[in-house]
Curated annotation (Swiss-Prot):
SUPFAM superfamilies: lambda repressor-like DNA-binding domains, Periplasmic binding protein-like I. GO terms for molecular function: DNA-binding transcription factor activity; transcription cis-regulatory region binding. This is HTH-type transcriptional repressor PurR. Residues 2-56 form the HTH lacI-type domain. Is the main repressor of the genes involved in the de novo synthesis of purine nucleotides, regulating purB, purC, purEK, purF, purHD, purL, purMN and guaBA expression. PurR is allosterically activated to bind its cognate DNA by binding the purine corepressors, hypoxanthine or guanine, thereby effecting transcription repression. The keyword Lyase does not apply. It comes from Haemophilus influenzae (strain PittEE). Gene3D superfamilies: 3.40.50.2300, lambda repressor-like DNA-binding domains.
């Protein structure tokens, strides 16, 4: 691998001159500059990123810590983050924790050693222990993206209550009165607020919620599949079902199909998130859209602002608002 000394020797100049050409830090005669650039090209020379980072105190890199990158919703946010980082000239180090506190600690230490310019942390919930751990790395500019009501993090307000209300109201407006729900774990903020939106829409329409049609999953396709199979053992079935994310809707549709039932002819289903694959479900899924693209971009922009002003003292926490929108496809039928 070529070094700066090799470039200087081929161009017949000093290493200092080569450095000035690369970094554009001083005027260099045109002939000399061309000789240096020609030597760089011939030798396929690439300046040492490590040495450069030590000199300018920046690595043009960002670390991102996530619970998982497998879930489609989070994967689409991560894609948006990576794309926006790339466009801004930053590399992204992605670390999956799988909710393991030891992995979180090890990843933070590794990213600190790599001298990343900033950190994005994206988990659906945070314990006090995890917040205390993050605070011990507070010298690194950081955006902690939280869906919960935490006072010590940046807040992502995805208006889950409004989204749950919107999904249920659409089913009601299509004539459905017997409506079930597969929600997430109700001790989690996102799941609970979507369920509360469902409750509000049912209450406004003076419809009774059948407790047997309220099933709790964990936002995985297996949960939708298992919950639907439990639902299908009941004597009376709902005409419509609100699945609180798209992958649980996929599992529910799979279970229905195995029993010879059809969506929406035998049961209407509405999802939540509008993941990319939802338009290719059979049938294409009516769902609630959340802009993962905008969420990723805003998070990166907030972090870049903190990196730029990191020497100006404590930064105020930010709020990212994501407005839910109804996307009508073909998985809900009108029975008016």
């Amino acid at each position: 691998m070529a070094t700066i000394k090799d470039v200087a020797k081929m161009a017949g100049v000093s290493t200092t001159t080569v450095s000035h050409v690369i970094n554009k830090t001083r005027f260099v005669a045109k002939d000399t500059e061309e000789a240096v650039l020609s030597a760089i090209k011939q030798l396929n020379y690439s300046p040492s990123a490590v040495a450069r980072s030590l000199k300018v105190n920046t690595t043009k890199s960002i670390g991102m810590i996530v619970t998982t990158s497998e879930a489609p919703y989070f994967a689409e946010i991560i894609h948006s983050v990576e794309e926006h980082c790339y466009r801004q000239g930053y590399s992204l180090f992605l670390c999956n924790t799988q909710n393991d506190p030891e992995k979180v600690k090890n990843h933070l230490e590794m990213l600190a050693k790599k001298r990343v310019d900033g950190l994005l942390v994206m988990c659906s919930e945070y314990t006090q222990d995890s917040l205390d751990l993050l605070s011990s790395f507070s010298t690194i500019p950081m955006v902690v993206m939280d869906w919960g009501p935490n006072a010590n993090t940046d807040v992502i307000d995805d208006h889950s209550f409004d989204g749950g209300y919107l999904a249920t109201k659409h089913l009601i407006e299509c004539g459905h009165k017997k409506i079930g729900i597969i929600c997430g774990e109700l001790n989690k903020t996102t799941a609970r607020t979507r369920y509360e939106g469902f409750e509000k829409a049912m209450e406004e329409a003076k419809l009774t919620i059948n407790p047997s049609w309220v099933l709790e999953g964990a936002f995985e396709p297996e949960d939708g599949y298992e919950c639907m199979n439990r639902l299908l053992t009941q004597e009376e079935l709902p005409t419509a079902l609100f699945c609180c994310n798209d992958v649980m809707a996929l599992g529910a549709i799979s279970a229905l199909t195995e029993k010879g039932l059809r969506v929406p002819e035998d049961m209407s289903i509405i999802g939540y998130d509008d993941i990319h694959a939802s338009r290719f479900y059979a049938p294409p899924l009516t769902t609630i859209h959340q802009s993962k693209l905008r969420l990723g971009r805003q998070a990166v922009n907030i972090l870049l602002e903190r990196i730029t002003h990191k020497d100006e003292g404590v930064q105020q926490y930010s709020r990212i608002d994501i407005t839910p929108e109804l996307i009508i496809r073909k998985s809900v039928k009108s029975i008016l």
